[in-house]
């Protein structure tokens, strides 16, 4: 479809932006519907409001504009006919169609700078051969038979093809033999074929020349293997060895037979050895157990610091206190007596251990470790001990390893275990934590040259080497050379279900798989996980295209519960991890390359990170909105000289000149979790001894909270009484939407604690002002949970989706945690609304939980706490939500919204992780910049000004953005930070192919069966 007014699958907010920029009543465009497959949406501007009409297709493929009840339907054969009809006045629309909004023309797609041409650009070898035209044999053949011209052409073609191949690994004598065949002897074989012969004597002669060494080795190796096989399997018949030897002639068939025999023998031999080993006495390796580990600490007693030793015996479940390392045990505490570990925030070496004494009283013991890494290792071992001896049948906490590595199209080295042990630079694990294996490993690779089997075998072997655990492959997904592998401990296999995989191409024309993403998702008991491994467009100047890659992946990757498909992708999982070669670069002039190198050598990473494109884009909330990233304390992972980590190669000779690749943090790990879900990043760094690629592997480890399938302790007979079950009530709810649309709204509620989706009635009242619409909802339906136990409900979340009554399209989705900080039954809430990764508004109100029995159980991850320090807290960034809400309160001029924000700030949703943004300092000693006023990745919900738009569009209130001090020198000048809304960003990549794999989505039993009546039928 090539009509200028048809914009394909652009988002609703993008359509509103385009109409706002036009600013004329009667402006219109057509886009794909976001709610109904194979339907369209006609968007019309009238009096600064956007009206959207759904265009449906019936069984006869006729099109019609969805009309109100009682209005006759008009049918059209195509969109052009429909548009021409509604260009007339007074035919049913709010205004007639006058000014089509033409689709933005996209520039030609440039090949990716890292995409190597195929075949490899290897200069041809100078072969010594005699051209066919100079040989008497060929001259004679040409003179005698005109048909030999075809043989000559074939000879030249094959010879040219062979010259274009990479022949660096071929021996000289083999090169000469192949060239002689192509230039001389192939003509003889051609003559044989034309005369009806079934043999190729010259080609067989060539094969035997090339395989002389192979034949000799086969003759020598077979008897040895046969003897070994007899030793392993003595039941073989005595005549076995006499049957194996084959005639010693040099025929091709003989060699093929020997190869077949050798292949069969090696395969059978390996299986027999496995059987012998499995039947032998299985002795579990000591590495599968955690040995007792001793920490040297200082104990504060009455103001006196004394050296002492803490011995952690995970296997026996004891914490032993000793005065000397090799001395006797002075006192020990079983795991049940260790109540709490409290980390000091002000002093990173200090730890308080809360113990239960004999008289059921508590005692606090304060210790100072050698460094913060030792303290963290001690806490992880104690946490492991508590988990091991808790007596719980199901875990409520997992340890997850996330790894990403651009392999650079090179095979990995033999030893990659430092990657999985988090050895290298950055926030790494202490040596004492080496014995703690992770529950789940998620490995993402880019430019991976290995097959799936080769790579998974390598991973399993490496993990077995360091843990002695035979990890189970849960799933793999590969898009060309982008791959994700998920492995888990064998004991977790039955807890993992609903595994999904999918991929999205974002490469050249969005069809080639050279760039894109692969994803995997699954349920772990009652908790949903999603993982995305992406390889985005490269090139420092292609930041906008990378941003578009991100939105395409977010919009078109199909994973998770299919009943949550109306929701933003980031709302479909309790925990979502995004990893890969994101390819965001340092936004600095190429002339600063050497200064950058010096800053890296001096480990002054915090002076470079403010210029990181990903941080800059997240600070403006243009991408990865509400995602988190651990503080980066490791050097840039790209572009190294292969074989070493001592030197960055920041220049590359191209046909157009020298190309600069400044050292950059291309390889990243980010995450987003539901509010009040426990997640803690325990390490984030890169290796420094895996050098086969120009990228360094990056690792991250996470402690993640999970929920189990809940079993109510109440009388099962009570569950039939709905009144006794109790309800979840939402009251005084308002939604503030950043939209110019003129429509009515309703809410859909989704949750694992609800049997089915619940739909509200239309909102009672709404008012708009400057592209912001405040929608007030009256009495909302009471939500009946499947289980009313408070212990169960406090682990649940409520997903809300605000939809248009006219088109059933979403205007924003949010997540509300039912866990609260106090004991009040009724408490306020406020959640940010997003759609397709962009912020679209706020939803605030009050929620009341049923006053049923039960209380919240202490979670194992609550065993380790952080003692807050006010002086430290003041130096750190404010909480992302409170920071965002504070900006909203300042920026918004609407009194109702200010009241809602103030109420939200009284009870913020807390997170376990916080974005870290270092103090901004320029590379040059003369250039200084103040710390940013907002953390990266979070923007207040203030309306955003769109310059050049004659109509006040979505969020066009003329308000100045928060002040930011800029760099004082031109060579470090930033790009303009007063950006437009994300929806108005230039689309610099072609339309993406929408995945058509609905089978990848699954029914989640926690949500009940899919109700097909929720969605209109498609033609």
UniProtKB/Swiss-Prot annotation:
GO cellular component: cytoskeleton; cytosol; membrane raft; plasma membrane
Keywords in alphabetical order: Cell membrane, Cytoplasm, Cytoskeleton, Hydrolase, Immunity, Lipid metabolism, Membrane, Phosphoprotein, Repeat, SH2 domain, SH3-binding
Biased composition annotated in UniProt, kind: Acidic residues: 103-116
Post-translational modification: Tyrosine phosphorylated by the members of the SRC family after exposure to a diverse array of extracellular stimuli.
InterPro entries (UniProt xref): Endo/exonu/phosph_ase_sf (IPR036691), IPPc (IPR000300), SH2 (IPR000980), SH2_dom_sf (IPR036860)
Biased composition (Polar residues): 909-931, 958-980, 1010-1019
Motif (SH3-binding 2): 966-971
EC number: 3.1.3.86, 3.1.3.56, 3.1.3.36
Span of the annotated motif SH3-binding 1: 120-125
Domain named SH2: residues: 5-101
Sequence segments annotated as region (Disordered): 103-133, 909-1019
Keyword check for Ribonucleoprotein: no
Pfam family, one: Exo_endo_phos2
Localization: Cytoplasm; Cell membrane; Membrane raft; Cytoplasm, Cytoskeleton
A Gene Ontology molecular function term of the record: SH3 domain binding
Catalytic activity: a 1,2-diacyl-sn-glycero-3-phospho-(1D-myo-inositol-3,4,5-trisphosphate) + H2O = a 1,2-diacyl-sn-glycero-3-phospho-(1D-myo-inositol-3,4-bisphosphate) + phosphate; 1D-myo-inositol 1,3,4,5-tetrakisphosphate + H2O = 1D-myo-inositol 1,3,4-trisphosphate + phosphate; a 1,2-diacyl-sn-glycero-3-phospho-(1D-myo-inositol-4,5-bisphosphate) + H2O = a 1,2-diacyl-sn-glycero-3-phospho-(1D-myo-inositol 4-phosphate) + phosphate
Residues found modified as Phosphotyrosine: 1007
UniProt short sequence motif NPXY motif, positions renumbered to this chain: 1004-1007
Origin superkingdom: Eukaryota
GO biological process: immune system process; negative regulation of bone resorption; negative regulation of neutrophil differentiation; negative regulation of signal transduction; phosphatidylinositol dephosphorylation; positive regulation of B cell differentiation; regulation of immune response
Bilayer topology: Peripheral membrane protein
Family assignment from sequence similarity: Belongs to the inositol 1,4,5-trisphosphate 5-phosphatase family.
Domain text: The SH2 domain interacts with tyrosine phosphorylated forms of proteins. The NPXY sequence motif found in many tyrosine-phosphorylated proteins is required for the specific binding of the PID domain.
Its biological purpose: Phosphatidylinositol (PtdIns) phosphatase that specifically hydrolyzes the 5-phosphate of phosphatidylinositol-3,4,5-trisphosphate (PtdIns(3,4,5)P3) to produce PtdIns(3,4)P2, thereby negatively regulating the PI3K (phosphoinositide 3-kinase) pathways. Able also to hydrolyzes the 5-phosphate of phosphatidylinositol-4,5-bisphosphate (PtdIns(4,5)P3) and inositol 1,3,4,5-tetrakisphosphate. Acts as a negative regulator of B-cell antigen receptor signaling.
Name listed for the protein in its UniProt record: Phosphatidylinositol 3,4,5-trisphosphate 5-phosphatase 1
Name of encoding gene: inpp5d
């Amino acid at each position: 479809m090539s009509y200028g007014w048809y914009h394909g699958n652009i988002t609703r907010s993008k359509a509103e932006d385009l109409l706002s920029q036009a600013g004329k009543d009667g402006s219109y465009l057509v886009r794909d519907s976001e709610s109904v497959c194979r339907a369209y949406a006609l968007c019309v501007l009238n009096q600064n409001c956007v009206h959207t009409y759904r265009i449906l297709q019936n069984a006869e493929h006729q099109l019609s504009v969805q009309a109100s009840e009682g209005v006759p339907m008009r049918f059209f054969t195509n969109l052009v006919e429909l548009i021409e009809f509604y260009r007339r006045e007074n035919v049913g629309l709010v205004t007639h169609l006058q000014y089509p909004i033409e689709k933005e023309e996209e520039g030609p797609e440039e090949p990716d700078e890292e995409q190597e041409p195929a075949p490899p650009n290897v200069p041809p070898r100078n072969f010594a051969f005699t051209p066919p035209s100079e040989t008497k044999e060929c001259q004679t053949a040409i003179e005698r038979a005109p048909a030999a011209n075809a043989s000559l052409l074939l000879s030249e073609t094959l010879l040219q093809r062979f010259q274009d191949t990479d022949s660096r690994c071929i021996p000289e004598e083999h090169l000469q033999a192949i060239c002689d065949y192509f230039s001389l002897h192939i003509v003889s074989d051609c003559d044989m074929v034309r005369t009806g012969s079934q043999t190729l004597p010259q080609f067989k002669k060539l094969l035997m020349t090339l395989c002389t060494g192979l034949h000799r080795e086969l003759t020598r190796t077979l008897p040895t293997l046969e003897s070994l096989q007899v030793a392993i399997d003595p039941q073989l018949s005595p005549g076995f060895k006499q049957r194996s030897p084959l005639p010693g002639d040099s025929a091709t068939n003989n060699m093929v037979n020997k190869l077949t025999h050798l292949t069969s023998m090696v395969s059978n031999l390996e299986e027999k050895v496995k059987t012998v080993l499995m039947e032998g006495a299985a002795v579990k390796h000591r590495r599968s157990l955690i040995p007792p580990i001793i920490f040297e600490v200082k104990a504060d007693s009455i103001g006196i610091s004394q050296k002492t030793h803490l011995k952690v015996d995970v296997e026996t479940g004891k914490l032993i206190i000793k005065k000397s390392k090799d001395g006797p045990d002075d006192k020990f505490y079983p795991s049940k007596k260790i109540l709490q570990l409290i980390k000091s925030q002000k002093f990173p070496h200090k730890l308080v251990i809360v113990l239960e004494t004999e008289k059921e009283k508590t005692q606090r013991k304060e210790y100072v470790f050698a460094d913060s890494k030792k303290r963290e290792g001690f806490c992880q071992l104690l946490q492991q001990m508590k988990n091991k001896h808790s007596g719980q049948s199901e875990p409520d906490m997992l340890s997850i390893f996330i790894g990403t590595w651009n392999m650079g199209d090179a095979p990995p080295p033999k030893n990659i275990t430092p990657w999985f042990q988090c050895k290298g630079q950055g926030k790494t694990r202490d040596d004492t934590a080496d014995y703690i294996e992770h529950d789940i490993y998620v490995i993402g690779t880019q430019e991976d040259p290995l097959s799936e089997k080769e790579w998974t075998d390598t991973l399993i072997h490496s993990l077995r080497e360091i843990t002695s655990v035979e990890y189970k492959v849960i799933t793999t997904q590969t898009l060309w050379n982008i791959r994700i592998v998920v492995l888990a401990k064998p004991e977790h296999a039955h807890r993992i279900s609903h595994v999904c995989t999918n991929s999205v191409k974002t490469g050249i024309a969005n069809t080639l798989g050279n760039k894109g993403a692969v994803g995997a998702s699954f349920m772990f008991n009652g908790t949903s996980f999603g993982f995305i491994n992406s390889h985005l467009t490269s090139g420092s100047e292609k930041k906008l295209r990378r941003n578009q890659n991100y939105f395409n992946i977010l919009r078109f990757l199909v994973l998770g519960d299919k009943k949550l498909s109306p929701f933003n992708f980031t709302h479909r999982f309790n925990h979502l991890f995004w990893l890969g070669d994101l390819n965001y670069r340092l936004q600095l002039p190429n002339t600063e390359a050497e200064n950058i190198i010096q800053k890296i050598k001096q480990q002054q990473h915090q002076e470079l990170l403010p210029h990181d494109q990903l941080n800059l884009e997240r600070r403006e909330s243009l991408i990865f909105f509400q995602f988190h990233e651990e503080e980066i304390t490791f050097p840039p992972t790209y572009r190294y000289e292969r074989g070493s980590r001592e030197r960055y190669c920041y220049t590359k000779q191209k046909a157009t000149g020298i190309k600069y690749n400044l050292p950059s943090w291309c390889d990243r790990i980010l995450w987003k979790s539901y509010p009040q879900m426990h997640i803690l990043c325990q390490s984030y760094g890169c290796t420094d001894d895996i050098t086969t690629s120009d990228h360094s592997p990056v690792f991250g480890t996470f402690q993640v909270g999970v929920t189990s399938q809940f079993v109510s302790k109440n009388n099962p007979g009570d569950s039939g009484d709905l009144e006794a079950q109790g309800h979840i009530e939402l009251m005084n709810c308002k939604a503030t939407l950043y939209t110019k649309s003129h429509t009515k709204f309703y809410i859909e509620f989704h949750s694992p604690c609800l049997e089915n989706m619940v739909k509200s009635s239309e909102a009672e009242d709404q008012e708009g002002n400057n592209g912001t619409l405040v929608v007030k909802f009256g009495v909302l339906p009471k939500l009946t949970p499947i289980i009313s136990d408070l212990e169960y409900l406090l682990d649940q979340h409520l997903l809300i989706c605000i939809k248009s009554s006219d088109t059933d399209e979403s205007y924003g989705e949010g997540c509300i945690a039912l866990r609260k900080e106090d004991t009040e039954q009724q408490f306020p809430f406020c959640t940010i609304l997003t759609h397709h990764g962009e912020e679209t508004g706020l939803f605030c109100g009050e929620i009341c939980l049923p006053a049923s029995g039960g209380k919240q159980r202490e979670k194992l991850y609550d065993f380790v706490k952080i003692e807050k320090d006010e002086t430290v807290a003041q130096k750190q960034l404010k909480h992302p939500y409170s920071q965002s809400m504070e900006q909203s309160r300042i920026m918004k001029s609407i009194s109702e919204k200010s009241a809602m924000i103030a109420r939200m700030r009284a009870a913020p949703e807390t997170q376990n992780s916080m974005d870290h943004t270092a103090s901004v300092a320029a590379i040059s000693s003369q250039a200084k910049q103040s710390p940013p006023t907002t953390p990266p990745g979070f923007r207040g919900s203030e309306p955003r000004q769109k310059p050049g738009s004659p109509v006040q569009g979505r969020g066009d209130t003329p308000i100045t953005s928060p002040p930011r001090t800029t760099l004082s020198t031109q060579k470090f000048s930033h790009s303009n930070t007063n950006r437009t809304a994300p929806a108005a960003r230039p689309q610099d990549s072609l339309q993406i192919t929408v995945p058509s794999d609905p089978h990848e989505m699954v029914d989640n039993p926690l949500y009940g069966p899919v109700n097909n009546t929720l969605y209109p039928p498609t033609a």
